[in-house]
């Protein structure tokens, strides 16, 4: 991502406003906040990054692959849910602006939800 000629490297745990369009089918759509999941070394050298979309439209109880992020954490203006079942690789050109960063306790919840989403742990 370029800003005034300066290259900016997203870091794991940061929230960015991301343009997800165009999409196909049930993929998450429109410009919305997303959580950077990719490690910092890859974020420094790769033109792509891995993100999880956020939504402010959710119902409780949450699924095991969802993590609640309450205002003002991450620079969000409304309570939102990280959708760890909507993990996606994107070109960094889709990153619009940095909103904030998650607290370590929330990142731990995200890590657990990723493990569940990818089948790396048993739910039982």
Task: Tell me the role of every PLM-derived stretch.
Residues 26-30, 36-72:
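Compact nucleic-acid interaction/catalytic patches
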Residues 21-25:
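Short, charged beta-turn/beta-strand-edge "cap" motif at the junction between a beta-strand
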Residues 2-3, 8, 72-124:
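C-terminal terminal-subdomain/extension
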Residues 34-35, 51, 84, 110:
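A structural motif
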């Amino acid at each position: 991502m370029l800003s005034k000629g300066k290259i900016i490297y997203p870091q794991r745990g940061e929230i960015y406003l991301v343009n997800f369009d165009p999409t196909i089918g049930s993929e998450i759509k429109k410009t919305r906040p997303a959580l950077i999941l990719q490690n910092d070394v890859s974020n420094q050298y790769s033109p792509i990054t891995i993100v999880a979309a956020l939504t402010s439209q959710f119902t409780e109880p949450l699924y095991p692959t969802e993590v609640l992020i309450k205002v003002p954490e991450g620079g969000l203006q409304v309570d939102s849910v990280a959708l760890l079942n909507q993990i996606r690789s994107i070109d960094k050109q889709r990153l619009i602006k940095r909103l904030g960063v998650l607290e370590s306790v929330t990142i731990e919840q995200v890590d657990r939800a990723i493990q569940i989403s990818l089948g790396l742990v048993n739910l039982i």
